[in-house]
Design a protein with these regions (language model features):
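Juxtamembrane/interface motifs at transmembrane-helix termini
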Residues: 54-57, 66-68, 81-82, 109-111
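Short loop/turn motifs at secondary-structure junctions and domain boundaries
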Residues: 68-74, 160
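Acyl-donor (CoA/ACP) binding surface of acyl/acetyltransferases
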Residues: 1-42, 77, 81-188
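Hydrophobic residues in alpha-helical segments
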Residues: 39, 48, 70-71
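Conserved GNAT-fold acetyl-CoA-binding loop/helix
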Residues: 43-65, 76
Length: 188
């Protein structure tokens, strides 16, 4: 079956979602402290290629910018809140959208003290389902450091298949590192 149309996305009104242990909502200014930790904790940063200006204004700008870009359907990002504690545990979303190809790139980051609890697997499952059912995606792609074993396991647990590795494709902390590409396809 050939799809001869380009997808159009609209994230307004914003979709608040749930999974077993996680509530997914729009990122807000009240999430400043958690976003600061996600952006600047070196234990988290070791797997992320982006370099961020370290300032209060940069964190506030990131939060405002994510809302604007979501309203403009350039991306969609959810703040993940653990239901039992109502504490922010991370961020997940589609950071690159390719509507002409019916494809998007999923990305997520968890606070370090939330690693190893199964939250990444649960969130990837829920947001992948949203991508297929609500956004009508054909392909969801993830790009991860092969050294980030927890992230690789979360993807594989949800059926993502390893597509290949780009050698020394990103610079993290002034060192070149590989990127593993994983994909999940909607079966029609």
């Amino acid at each position: 079956m050939y799809l001869r149309y380009m997808l159009t996305f609209s994230f307004s009104p914003f979709s608040h979602l749930h999974s077993e242990r996680i509530y997914y909502r729009q990122l807000e200014e009240k999430d400043y402290d958690a976003v600061y930790q996600l952006r600047y904790d070196p234990r988290v940063r070791r797997f992320i290629s982006s370099e961020y200006e370290k300032s209060d204004e940069a964190v506030s700008h990131f939060i405002r910018d994510s809302k604007i870009k979501t309203e403009n359907a350039e991306l969609v990002m959810w703040c993940m809140e653990e239901k039992s504690t109502q504490q922010v545990i991370g961020i997940i979303g589609y950071f690159r959208l390719y509507p002409e190809h019916h494809r998007a790139e999923i990305g997520y980051v968890l606070l370090h003290d939330q690693w190893g609890k199964g939250f990444a697997s649960e969130a990837v499952e829920r947001i992948s389902l949203y991508g297929f059912e609500e956004m009508n995606l054909h392909t969801i792609e993830a790009r991860v450091s092969p050294l980030n074993i927890g992230s690789v396991k979360a993807l594989e647990k949800n059926g993502y298949q390893w597509e290949g590795t780009l050698k020394e494709s990103y610079r993290v902390n002034d060192e070149f590192t590989d990127t593993a590409i994983y994909s999940l396809f909607q079966r029609i």
